[in-house]
Regions:
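A short core secondary-structure module
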Residues: 147, 151-195
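Short glycine/proline-enriched turns and hinge-like loops at secondary-structure junctions
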Residues: 64-65, 133-135, 159-163, 177-180, ...
Length: 414
């Protein structure tokens, strides 16, 4: 079993680490306090190839593997969650879905400029009454000649007000539940398509979150991705890709909290000795170490499976669930280690705490992932498909039980 990184992977890791240290972290606290989205940093990410990191070179991407993507997301979220969120939405939810389901013409039209960062994309799935229950969406797409007319709205959409276009999911057959959902690329500037900022969020202040509104928006039929009724499948595929980057970003949060806490615990003294000498502080540090190591192992297991072309819904779900919960716990502990300084916005620790809360909700809540894992273990379904792939390291694929299982829809929160 080889845990070594290749020279290419180490080079990518070092390059992104320097970028975060030089371009993101110096302004991270100020941008967060001022609710400022640093577009120059996004341009820098594009120049490094991060916005097309796993997209093949033939479509303008960097053509790197998923281990590289995980390493990049870890480093980026060590600096700022808003920029890892962009990778999740732009690359994971959108570009990889286009790569799998888009026609060659659609790939040239949208994927190529997305991979270079020339254009940014967002993912329009979540609605006010349709989060985990995707099939409950109200947005509709009615066929009229060579177009579809979209009506409805989406909320909690990352980069809604910045993206050049959105991958939007709407019901072409409202009576068919999830089988009646289709996917469309809706471009900014189309008449009737508007966006609005979402304000007063708990965290990710340095990012962009908003709403999408569709009022009789005529979308050419050629903008449909895949086939009519294939939207749910496309959304679930995109979520597998997005969840992977969320998990990898969670690893970055834990590492940031651990590094800052270790540094502080070695320097801060009380009663004549560093606070790191006290067992209660050591307990918190050790818990962060465990969270980091276990989360990274789960992420790398999923990355390996993705690079082998194996279905990894189960493994990615585990990684997302564990890493996001561990990240929030690590941020809580880091504040405790730092005491009053951890509570101060200017010190930058509480930012990780606020930002780490959202990933526990989007890309499937913790409760959704627990349900998925339990149903898999009980044999009610195989998350990687009937007779699907399993990790050779920690396989768990019981025979499917011949019982009726409850219907379950999986959430994006995007």
């Amino acid at each position: 079993m080889d845990f070594e990184l290749t020279d290419e992977q180490r080079l990518l890791q070092d390059t992104v680490r320097r970028f975060v240290d030089e371009r993101i972290l110096p302004n991270a606290v100020e941008n967060d306090i001022n609710h400022h989205l640093d577009l120059d940093a996004i341009q820098g990410m594009a120049e490094l190839g991060i916005l097309g990191i796993v997209i093949p070179e033939e479509y303008g991407g960097a053509g790197l593997d998923f281990v590289c993507e995980a390493l990049a997301c870890e480093e980026i979220e060590r600096g700022e969650a808003a920029f890892r969120t962009l990778i999740s939405v732009h690359v994971g939810l959108n570009s990889l879905a286009l790569l799998k389901y888009g026609s060659e013409e659609q790939k040239q039209r949208w994927l190529v400029p997305q991979a270079s960062g020339e254009k940014l994309a967002c993912f329009g799935l979540t609605e006010p009454a349709a989060g985990s229950d995707v099939a409950a969406m109200k947005t509709t797409a009615r066929r009229e000649d060579d177009s579809y007319v979209l009506n409805g709205s989406k909320n909690w959409i990352s980069y809604a007000n910045v993206a050049d276009h959105a991958l939007v999911f709407a019901k072409t057959d409202p009576s068919a539940e999830h089988k009646g959902i289709s996917a469309f690329v809706v471009e900014r500037g189309m008449p009737g398509f508007t966006t609005l900022d979402t304000e007063h969020k708990l965290g990710i202040w340095a990012g962009s979150t908003g709403e999408l509104f569709f009022e009789n928006v005529e979308v050419p039929a050629e903008n449909m991705i895949g086939e009519e009724g294939q939207g749910f499948e496309i959304a679930m595929y995109g979520l597998d890709q997005g969840r992977f980057t969320v998990a990898a970003g969670g690893v970055g949060v834990i590492r940031a909290c651990l590094e800052r806490s270790v540094e502080y615990a070695r320097e801060r003294e009380t009663f004549g000795q560093p606070i790191g000498k006290y067992q209660f502080v050591q307990d918190m540090i050790s818990e962060m170490v465990l969270g980091y190591e276990t989360s990274k192992l789960l992420v790398m297991q999923a990355a390996w499976m993705k690079d082998q072309g194996l279905r990894n819904t189960r493994e990615t779900s585990l990684a997302k669930w564990h890493a996001t919960e561990s990240a929030f716990r690590a941020a809580h502990l880091a504040i405790q280690v730092h005491g009053a300084y951890g509570y101060s916005a200017e010190y930058g620790i509480e930012r990780y705490f606020r930002n780490a809360r959202a990933p526990i909700i989007y890309e499937g809540t913790t409760q959704i992932h627990k349900m998925m894992q339990a149903e898999h273990a009980l044999g009610f379904r195989n998350l990687n498909g009937r007779g699907g792939d399993v990790s050779p390291l920690c396989s768990w694929a019981p025979a499917l039980a011949s019982v009726n299982r409850p219907k379950a829809s999986l959430s994006s929160g995007r």
